[in-house]
C-alpha cells in the first residue's frame, strides 16, 4: 500500500502515522525526517538542501522532488505513508510519474479545533512529553507530571505563527484535496475526535482494502 496523508497542521497526521506503523506495518516517510537524514548523512543534494533550511527558506519543489525520489527508491518494495511529503500540485504531479498511490487520506478538522490543539500544546523541556492545556493538562500548571520540569510552548505553536501556517496551507495544500478527488483517490475522515479516528481507519482499511491489523 502507498498512502498519502493530507491535512492541516494539528489535524493528527503524526498520531495516525504512529498508529498505522504499529498496527499495519507501514513505513512512515515524512519530509522533515527525510531532510534531516539527508543532511546528517550528507546524502545527495545535502549541501543545497542545508543552504535553504539554514536560512529559513522554503525548499523548492524541484529539489524536494529529487530528495523524495531518492528516499522512495529505497522503499518501493514496502508499504508506506507519505506524511507531509506532498505539499503542492507540482509535487503531486511529480509523484505520479514514479508511483501509483492507493489512497490519499484527508484528515478533516474544523479550524477552531486545530487552533486549540496547536496553541494549547506544551512540551516538557526535559523528557519531551507532550501536553495540551485544553485536553490533557498537567496536574500542576506548566510543570511536567513525570519529572517536575517546566513545560514550554514551541514558537511554531504561537497563534501568530499558526495563522501564517494555516494561510500557507490553504494556498499550497488545499488544492491537493481536489487534485486527488478528481483521481478518485481521496478519502476524507473526520479527525475532530481522536478517540474515534483509529476505529474509522480500521473500518476504512477493512472495507476498502480488506486489510486487518497485524497486532
Swiss-Prot record:
Consists of three domains, a large central CORE domain and two small peripheral domains, NMPbind and LID, which undergo movements during catalysis. The LID domain closes over the site of phosphoryl transfer upon ATP binding. Assembling and dissambling the active center during each catalytic cycle provides an effective means to prevent ATP hydrolysis. Some bacteria have evolved a zinc-coordinating structure that stabilizes the LID domain. This is Adenylate kinase. Zn(2+) binds at residues 124, 127, 144, 147. InterPro entries: Adenyl_kin_sub, Adenylat/UMP-CMP_kin, Adenylate_kinase_lid-dom, ADK_active_lid_dom_sf, P-loop_NTPase. AMP binds at residues 31, 36, 57-59, 91, 154, 165. Keywords: ATP-binding, Cytoplasm, Kinase, Metal-binding, Nucleotide biosynthesis, Nucleotide-binding, Transferase, Zinc. One of its GO terms (biological process) is AMP salvage.
Amino acid at each position: 500500500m502507498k498512502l498519502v496523508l493530507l491535512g492541516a497542521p494539528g489535524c493528527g497526521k503524526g498520531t495516525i502515522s504512529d498508529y498505522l506503523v504499529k498496527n499495519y506495518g507501514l513505513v512512515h516517510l515524512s519530509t522533515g525526517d527525510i531532510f534531516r537524514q539527508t543532511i546528517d548523512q550528507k546524502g545527495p543534494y545535502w549541501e543545497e538542501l542545508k543552504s535553504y533550511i539554514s536560512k529559513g527558506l522554503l525548499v523548492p519543489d524541484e529539489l524536494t522532488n529529487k530528495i523524495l525520489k531518492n528516499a522512495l527508491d529505497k522503499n518501493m518494495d514496502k508499504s508506506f505513508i507519505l506524511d507531509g511529503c506532498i505539499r503542492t500540485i507540482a509535487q503531486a504531479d511529480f509523484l505520479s510519474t514514479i508511483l501509483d498511490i492507493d489512497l490519499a487520506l484527508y484528515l478533516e478538522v474544523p479550524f477552531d479545533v486545530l487552533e486549540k490543539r496547536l496553541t494549547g500544546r506544551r512540551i516538557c523541556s526535559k523528557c519531551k512529553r507532550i501536553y495540551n492545556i485544553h485536553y490533557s493538562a498537567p496536574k500542576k500548571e506548566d510543570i511536567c507530571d513525570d519529572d517536575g520540569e517546566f513545560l514550554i510552548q514551541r514558537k511554531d505553536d504561537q497563534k501568530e505563527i499558526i495563522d501564517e501556517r494555516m494561510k500557507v496551507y490553504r494556498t499550497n495544500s488545499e488544492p491537493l484535496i481536489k487534485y486527488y478527488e478528481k483521481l478518485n483517490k481521496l478519502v476524507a475522515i473526520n479527525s475532530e475526535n481522536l478517540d474515534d479516528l483509529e476505529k474509522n481507519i480500521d473500518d476504512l482499511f477493512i472495507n476498502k482494502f480488506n486489510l486487518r491489523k497485524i497486532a
